[in-house]
Amino acid sequence: MENLQLVLFVLGAVAIIAVLVHGFWSIRRQQPKSLKESPMTGLYTDKTRDSDGFDADGVGPVRVVKNNAEQGIPKATSTSRATPFGARAQESEPADVSPSFSLSDEPKQKAPRSRQEPVMSATPNEEVSDAHLEQMELGLGQAPAQPSLFEDPVTERKQEAVRPAPRVEAPQSVAPASVEPVSVEPEPAPKVAEETPLGDPQDVLVLHVVAKEGEALNGAELLPSLLTLNFKFGDMDIFHRHEDNAGTGKVLFSLANMVKPGVFNPDEMEQFTTQGIVLFMTLPCYGDPLMNFSIMLNSAHQLADDLGGEVLDGGRGAWSEQTKQSYLQRIRAQM
């Protein structure tokens, strides 16, 4: 058993070492080669150049241009070529020695020519001496019509600045066209249908809510019930039911005290008692008379349930289905 454990331990250690070695080898394999091992290293070495400083592709060394602001003439340095500076200047562009005369007093401006930058060398030992420059100026002075090979860049900038600016004509002021005022007519307000007067009442529908024999309706219970049914105290000191539940609009039907004088005092409702109340609706009325009568009948039944009374017709008779149908016929007769 101990030998088996030892063998398993050795095998596990060997497996771990193999996994680590394989991981390091994979990481090294995925890393990019260094610049020294790259096969493109040879491309970055300096190519061989000939005696004139040009390589096999005809590309020369980097040229540096220097300007001498004190003398007004840029100093030029020759390259490694053996050709003298004055000879190269004469070979590059032949001089036209024939002088040109003009009768006009205004001097003519020479057309700008393509300027060739001189080849400069960054080596201070190869700069042209002042005597050499004087000889070059004397040699070039024989051809007055020949333009200088090296023109001062500041002079070119001044000549460019002398060029006349293009004329910009001021835009002619155009008188604005007369705009006629447009009259906007206000939209007519929606016409409200004028309410036709109802005229004199032709019929009155009456319902009674009376207390049971030997009892009375209590005002402390009557007032909350009336407010719940959206009645509002108003004209003639009685309660009215309006078109709107908030107590606004036309009166649909009213509620009065059955006992003379038939009025209520809201401040004394807690001490108020009565034998009954009466609900009445005149015909014709505002709105739908059938709907108004249905609301009045439901209110009468609700008050009877809340106060412990009963509903009677206009003659204080028992309310029945036949009585209801007769009331509906009276309503339809007025429609």
UniProtKB/Swiss-Prot annotation:
Protein family per UniProt: Belongs to the ZipA family.
Descriptive protein name: Cell division protein ZipA
UniProt keyword Cell cycle, yes or no: yes
Side of membrane Periplasmic, spans: 1-6
Record-linked InterPro entries: Cell_div_ZipA, ZipA_FtsZ-bd_C, ZipA_FtsZ-bd_C_sf
UniProt key word Lipid metabolism: no
Superkingdom of the organism of origin: Bacteria
Subunit structure: Interacts with FtsZ via their C-terminal domains.
UniProt subcellular location: Cell inner membrane
Organism: Shewanella loihica (strain ATCC BAA-1088 / PV-4)
Biased composition (Low complexity): 170-185
Region (Disordered): 37-128, 163-185
SMART domains documented for this protein: ZipA_C
Keywords: Cell cycle, Cell division, Cell inner membrane, Cell membrane, Membrane, Transmembrane, Transmembrane helix
GO cellular component: cell division site; plasma membrane
Gene Ontology process terms (BP): division septum assembly; FtsZ-dependent cytokinesis
Topological domains annotated Cytoplasmic: 28-335
Membrane topology: Single-pass type I membrane protein
Annotated TM spans: 7-27
Main location: membrane
Pfam family, one: ZipA_C
PANTHER family noted in UniProt: CELL DIVISION PROTEIN ZIPA
Function according to Swiss-Prot or TrEMBL: Essential cell division protein that stabilizes the FtsZ protofilaments by cross-linking them and that serves as a cytoplasmic membrane anchor for the Z ring. Also required for the recruitment to the septal ring of downstream cell division proteins.
